[in-house]
């Protein structure tokens, strides 16, 4: 008779020990770069707006955008800027401390007037509250004013 009670007690303890713990979020955020279009063309001194839609299944934590010159790519240098051109690199960051699952990133970008002509890489990264990270990549060309396609 005691064995029935012990069995019932053990079964109850077993069921209580099974918690409803939420599973760990392993889903990476998603990024859709809306602008500039991949392989866009700009001139040194131009400005444009970086637009990207960030989303996560639970909560976004932060974002980062980086632009850097691709020194190995094809470039068009004009003789008047060859000595003064700089390999352009810039970075922007933002914290999303709330519990946002969606965020429209809108970041104005100004290309320096003395930016090196050639291909630049654009990297947009998103991090969620659990530490999952993802990145989206695109490129654009900084051209000389007199460049023709």
What role is predicted for each listed range?
Residues 19-32, 148:
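Proline/serine/threonine-rich low-complexity linkers at boundaries of modular beta-sandwich domains
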């Amino acid at each position: 008779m005691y064995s029935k009670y012990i069995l019932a007690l053990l079964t109850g303890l077993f069921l209580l020990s099974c918690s409803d713990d939420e599973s760990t979020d392993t889903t990476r955020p998603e990024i859709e770069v809306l602008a500039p279009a991949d392989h866009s063309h700009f001139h040194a001194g131009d400005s444009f707006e970086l637009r990207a839609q960030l989303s996560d299944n639970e909560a976004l934590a932060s974002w980062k955008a980086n632009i850097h010159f691709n020194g190995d790519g094809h470039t068009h240098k004009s003789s008047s800027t060859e000595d003064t051109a700089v390999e352009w690199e810039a970075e922007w960051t933002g914290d999303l401390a709330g519990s946002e699952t969606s965020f429209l990133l809108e970041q104005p970008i100004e290309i320096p007037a003395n930016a090196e002509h050639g291909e630049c890489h654009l990297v947009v990264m998103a991090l969620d509250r659990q530490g999952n990270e993802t990145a989206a990549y695109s490129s654009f060309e900084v051209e000389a004013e007199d460049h023709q396609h």
